[in-house]
Amino acid sequence: MMLFSVRFISGFVFGAGSGVAALKLYYYEEQQTHTGSSVHRVIGRFGLPESGAESRFYTNHVLSYDQTHRTPRWVAEHLSSTRLLGEANRKQCKFRPDPSVPELFTAHNEDYLKSGWSRGHMAPAGDNKSSEQAMAETFYLSNIVPQNYENNAGFWNRLEMYCRELTEKFSDVWVVSGPLMKPQITDDGKKTVSYQLIGKDEVAVPTHLYKVILAQKDPSSDALAVGAFVVPNAPIGFQHQLQEFQVSVCDLERESGLVFFPALQKQQLSDLCTVDSCQLMDFRRFSLYISSRKMQSANSVYRLEKILAELQEAGIAPDEHLKQIYQQRRTELERRQDTNTHT
């Protein structure tokens, strides 16, 4: 797994999260050629400042952790139609500090409590149904940023779903996600960066979130398409299209201080939104999807009927798929109720 992970990350992101081995080799070569190497040895006699592991490897994702902000700098994933399969259930998962992050630099659940911000995944739980461990690791707070509730459950959720849908059209999809602090221009024309800190650990609330998507149609082909998107950490309605938030990879690299997919010649990449539609789920499809999820977890017939009524109040007629879920879940709940009555 380590060999795969090193190859995996070397082609994903270089910058704040560059490979430790490459850095050590660089410093070694510098020491061998620089005439002041003895001075450097004295300077580093008791060690040089450290910012933690540059890259952290997990079952199904890789990330670089920002010990100052208590959030990830970036989180990298690889998606395919087969890798998305599995039966892992998030009901068994709990948010908790990453055991690999020193206690001094980790966020805690208490930081988010009553903060007004949700715990937003960068590597989504929905991408990690392949194993219980892979899904559980996405709930480490090293993979989490303070995110607006509506954005998390709405637009960002739809963007994550779009990434998964791409695996139906492309053989391989790589995704890099993370937080961003964008400057604001004050009345006097000056640029300033301002962001909230929450909890006793002072977890930084990003002003924006980014996602870079790289898609390959055929493993035997060099044809690749890329799309970079920056969205505000705020509610975004259904009237907005994903293309409104598309930026050039170069501009995102300049703002983030990261270089994405450094092994590629980016000028040779196609635009994802030209190759594909970059179309997120509309209000109707998304409402049906959310209702189906709610029905599958409903614990009473009353709750099941309420979900159906809420959907109809929104003017959306259930499709055949939702009707099947409704009937199946209703039968299960009624059988459970009969069993409890006779025991």
Swiss-Prot record:
GO terms for cellular component: mitochondrial inner membrane; nucleus. PANTHER family: ENDONUCLEASE RELATED, NUCLEASE EXOG, MITOCHONDRIAL. It comes from Danio rerio. It is found in: Mitochondrion inner membrane. Belongs to the DNA/RNA non-specific endonuclease family. Its EC number is 3.1.30.-. GO terms for biological process: apoptotic DNA fragmentation. InterPro entries: DNA/RNA_non-sp_Endonuclease_sf, Endo_G_ENPP1-like_dom, ENPP1-3/EXOG-like_nuc-like, Exog_C, His-Me_finger_sf, Non-specific_endonuclease. A divalent metal cation binds at N152. It holds the Pfam family Endonuclease_NS. Its main location: mitochondrion. Its cofactor is a divalent metal cation. SUPFAM superfamilies: His-Me finger endonucleases (SSF54060). Keywords: Endonuclease, Hydrolase, Membrane, Metal-binding, Mitochondrion, Mitochondrion inner membrane, Nuclease, Transit peptide. Homodimer. The lineage of its organism: Eukaryota, Metazoa, Chordata, Craniata, Vertebrata. This is Nuclease EXOG, mitochondrial. GO terms for molecular function: 5'-3' exonuclease activity; metal ion binding; nucleic acid binding; RNA endonuclease activity; single-stranded DNA endodeoxyribonuclease activity. Transmembrane segments: none annotated. Endo/exonuclease with nicking activity towards supercoiled DNA, a preference for single-stranded DNA and 5'-3' exonuclease activity. The active site contains 1 hydrated divalent metal cation that has only 1 direct interaction with the protein; all other interactions are via water molecules. The active site is at H121 (proton acceptor).
